[in-house]
Protein backbone atom coordinates (compact mmCIF):
# COMPACT_ATOMS: atom_id res chain seq x y z
CA UNK A 1 0.00 0.00 0.00
CA UNK A 2 1.61 3.30 -1.09
CA UNK A 3 0.09 5.20 1.74
CA UNK A 4 1.43 2.77 4.25
CA UNK A 5 4.87 2.89 2.64
CA UNK A 6 4.95 6.67 2.92
CA UNK A 7 3.88 6.49 6.51
CA UNK A 8 6.60 3.95 7.16
CA UNK A 9 9.19 6.25 5.56
CA UNK A 10 8.15 9.13 7.82
CA UNK A 11 8.36 6.83 10.77
CA UNK A 12 11.96 5.80 9.92
CA UNK A 13 13.22 9.40 9.16
CA UNK A 14 12.29 10.86 12.56
CA UNK A 15 15.13 9.24 14.55
CA UNK A 16 17.71 10.47 12.03
CA UNK A 17 16.68 14.09 12.62
CA UNK A 18 16.80 13.53 16.38
CA UNK A 19 20.36 12.18 16.21
CA UNK A 20 21.44 15.16 14.15
CA UNK A 21 19.99 17.60 16.70
CA UNK A 22 21.71 15.75 19.51
CA UNK A 23 25.02 15.94 17.66
CA UNK A 24 24.62 19.68 17.12
CA UNK A 25 23.72 20.17 20.78
CA UNK A 26 26.76 18.14 21.88
CA UNK A 27 28.99 20.17 19.57
CA UNK A 28 27.56 23.38 21.02
CA UNK A 29 28.05 22.16 24.57
CA UNK A 30 31.67 21.24 23.80
CA UNK A 31 32.34 24.65 22.28
CA UNK A 32 30.80 26.33 25.31
CA UNK A 33 32.83 24.10 27.63
CA UNK A 34 36.03 24.97 25.76
CA UNK A 35 35.21 28.66 26.06
CA UNK A 36 34.54 28.32 29.78
CA UNK A 37 37.70 26.30 30.23
CA UNK A 38 39.75 28.85 28.31
CA UNK A 39 38.24 31.65 30.41
CA UNK A 40 39.01 29.75 33.62
CA UNK A 41 42.60 29.02 32.55
CA UNK A 42 43.09 32.66 31.55
CA UNK A 43 41.71 33.80 34.92
CA UNK A 44 43.97 31.41 36.83
CA UNK A 45 47.02 32.50 34.84
CA UNK A 46 46.23 36.17 35.48
CA UNK A 47 45.77 35.43 39.17
CA UNK A 48 49.06 33.52 39.32
CA UNK A 49 50.90 36.35 37.55
CA UNK A 50 49.38 38.85 39.98
CA UNK A 51 50.42 36.72 42.97
CA UNK A 52 53.95 36.35 41.61
CA UNK A 53 54.21 40.10 41.00
CA UNK A 54 53.02 40.84 44.55
CA UNK A 55 55.41 38.26 45.97
CA UNK A 56 58.27 39.67 43.90
CA UNK A 57 57.49 43.21 45.06
CA UNK A 58 57.37 42.01 48.67
CA UNK A 59 60.71 40.25 48.25
CA UNK A 60 62.16 43.37 46.66
CA UNK A 61 61.17 45.43 49.71
CA UNK A 62 62.69 42.79 52.01
CA UNK A 63 65.91 42.72 49.96
CA UNK A 64 66.11 46.53 50.01
CA UNK A 65 65.61 46.48 53.79
CA UNK A 66 68.36 43.86 54.17
CA UNK A 67 70.72 45.92 52.01
CA UNK A 68 70.04 48.97 54.19
CA UNK A 69 70.61 46.96 57.37
CA UNK A 70 73.89 45.55 56.01
CA UNK A 71 75.01 49.06 55.06
CA UNK A 72 74.21 50.36 58.56
CA UNK A 73 76.06 47.45 60.18
CA UNK A 74 79.05 48.08 57.93
CA UNK A 75 79.05 51.76 58.92
CA UNK A 76 78.83 50.81 62.61
CA UNK A 77 81.75 48.39 62.25
CA UNK A 78 83.84 51.03 60.48
CA UNK A 79 82.95 53.57 63.17
CA UNK A 80 83.87 51.11 65.91
CA UNK A 81 87.17 50.26 64.20
CA UNK A 82 88.10 53.91 63.78
CA UNK A 83 86.98 54.94 67.29
CA UNK A 84 88.19 51.94 69.28
CA UNK A 85 91.29 53.18 71.12
CA UNK A 86 93.17 51.01 73.61
CA UNK A 87 96.79 50.31 74.49
CA UNK A 88 98.89 48.39 76.97
CA UNK A 89 102.66 48.71 77.27
CA UNK A 90 105.44 47.28 79.44
CA UNK A 91 109.21 47.59 79.70
CA UNK A 92 111.66 45.50 77.71
CA UNK A 93 114.44 46.41 80.15
CA UNK A 94 114.40 48.06 83.59
CA UNK A 95 114.98 51.80 83.82
CA UNK A 96 117.62 53.03 86.29
CA UNK A 97 118.37 56.48 87.68
CA UNK A 98 115.41 58.19 86.03
CA UNK A 99 115.80 61.98 86.15
CA UNK A 100 113.23 64.45 87.50
CA UNK A 101 110.22 64.83 85.14
CA UNK A 102 111.82 62.36 82.74
CA UNK A 103 109.37 60.26 80.71
CA UNK A 104 109.36 56.51 81.24
CA UNK A 105 109.35 54.90 77.80
CA UNK A 106 107.22 51.76 77.97
CA UNK A 107 108.66 50.13 74.87
CA UNK A 108 107.06 46.66 74.94
CA UNK A 109 103.64 47.25 73.39
CA UNK A 110 101.06 44.51 73.95
CA UNK A 111 98.07 46.28 72.43
CA UNK A 112 97.84 49.52 70.46
CA UNK A 113 94.41 49.67 68.83
CA UNK A 114 94.06 53.01 67.11
CA UNK A 115 97.84 53.63 67.22
CA UNK A 116 97.41 56.41 69.79
CA UNK A 117 100.34 55.29 71.97
CA UNK A 118 103.71 56.31 70.53
CA UNK A 119 106.43 53.96 71.67
CA UNK A 120 109.23 56.25 70.46
CA UNK A 121 108.18 59.07 72.81
CA UNK A 122 106.33 57.11 75.50
CA UNK A 123 103.32 59.41 74.98
CA UNK A 124 99.67 58.66 74.38
CA UNK A 125 98.08 61.25 72.07
CA UNK A 126 94.28 61.51 72.07
CA UNK A 127 92.98 60.90 68.53
CA UNK A 128 89.74 62.73 69.37
CA UNK A 129 87.84 64.37 72.21
CA UNK A 130 86.43 62.01 74.82
CA UNK A 131 86.76 60.33 78.20
CA UNK A 132 89.75 58.04 78.69
CA UNK A 133 90.74 55.58 81.40
CA UNK A 134 94.42 55.21 82.36
CA UNK A 135 96.11 52.81 84.74
CA UNK A 136 99.76 52.79 85.81
CA UNK A 137 101.58 50.13 87.80
CA UNK A 138 105.11 50.91 88.98
CA UNK A 139 107.42 48.32 90.55
CA UNK A 140 110.81 49.09 92.07
CA UNK A 141 113.57 47.03 93.72
CA UNK A 142 114.87 46.85 97.30
CA UNK A 143 116.05 50.07 98.96
CA UNK A 144 114.31 52.24 96.35
CA UNK A 145 111.34 54.54 96.91
CA UNK A 146 109.97 55.82 93.64
CA UNK A 147 107.30 58.39 92.89
CA UNK A 148 105.91 58.60 89.38
CA UNK A 149 103.17 60.81 87.97
CA UNK A 150 100.66 60.55 85.16
CA UNK A 151 101.08 63.75 83.18
CA UNK A 152 98.33 65.26 81.03
CA UNK A 153 99.74 68.06 78.88
CA UNK A 154 102.74 68.35 81.26
CA UNK A 155 100.59 68.64 84.40
CA UNK A 156 100.32 66.07 87.19
CA UNK A 157 97.06 64.14 87.01
CA UNK A 158 97.84 61.42 89.57
CA UNK A 159 100.76 60.09 91.62
CA UNK A 160 102.04 56.51 91.92
CA UNK A 161 104.18 55.84 95.01
CA UNK A 162 106.17 52.57 94.96
CA UNK A 163 108.08 51.71 98.15
CA UNK A 164 110.58 48.83 98.36
CA UNK A 165 112.69 50.19 101.19
CA UNK A 166 112.22 46.98 103.20
CA UNK A 167 111.06 44.66 100.40
CA UNK A 168 112.67 42.76 97.57
CA UNK A 169 110.10 44.28 95.22
CA UNK A 170 107.62 47.07 95.86
CA UNK A 171 104.72 47.79 93.49
CA UNK A 172 102.01 50.45 93.43
CA UNK A 173 99.10 51.09 91.06
CA UNK A 174 96.79 53.97 90.42
CA UNK A 175 94.13 54.76 87.83
CA UNK A 176 92.24 57.79 86.60
CA UNK A 177 89.49 58.79 84.18
CA UNK A 178 90.30 62.00 82.33
CA UNK A 179 88.56 64.10 79.73
CA UNK A 180 90.86 64.83 76.80
CA UNK A 181 90.67 66.98 73.73
CA UNK A 182 92.03 65.82 70.41
CA UNK A 183 95.83 66.15 70.47
CA UNK A 184 96.19 66.13 74.27
CA UNK A 185 99.16 64.00 75.36
CA UNK A 186 99.50 61.70 78.36
CA UNK A 187 102.70 60.13 79.70
CA UNK A 188 104.25 58.64 82.83
CA UNK A 189 107.10 60.72 84.31
CA UNK A 190 109.37 60.79 87.36
CA UNK A 191 107.63 62.99 89.93
CA UNK A 192 110.28 65.63 90.53
CA UNK A 193 113.12 64.63 92.83
CA UNK A 194 110.82 62.86 95.32
CA UNK A 195 111.77 59.41 96.53
CA UNK A 196 114.94 57.53 97.44
CA UNK A 197 117.51 56.61 94.74
CA UNK A 198 118.36 54.60 92.72
CA UNK A 199 114.92 55.35 91.16
CA UNK A 200 114.70 51.92 89.57
CA UNK A 201 111.66 50.87 87.47
CA UNK A 202 111.19 47.09 87.20
CA UNK A 203 110.06 45.38 83.98
CA UNK A 204 106.83 44.34 85.74
CA UNK A 205 105.67 47.96 85.48
CA UNK A 206 102.84 48.75 83.03
CA UNK A 207 101.08 51.68 81.38
CA UNK A 208 97.54 51.04 80.09
CA UNK A 209 94.68 53.11 78.76
CA UNK A 210 91.57 53.07 76.61
CA UNK A 211 88.80 55.35 75.40
CA UNK A 212 85.47 55.10 77.23
CA UNK A 213 83.39 57.29 74.90
Swiss-Prot record:
Pfam families: C1q. It comes from the Eukaryota. InterPro entries: C1q_dom, Collagen/C1q_domain, Tumour_necrosis_fac-like_dom. Residues 80-213 form the C1q domain. Disulfide bonds: none annotated. The keyword Chloroplast does not apply. Its main location: secreted. One of its GO terms (molecular function) is metal ion binding. GO terms for cellular component: extracellular region. Keywords: Cadmium, Copper, Metal-binding, Secreted, Zinc. It is found in: Secreted. Pallium, gill and liver. Binds heavy metals. May function as a carrier of divalent cations in plasma. This is Heavy metal-binding protein HIP.
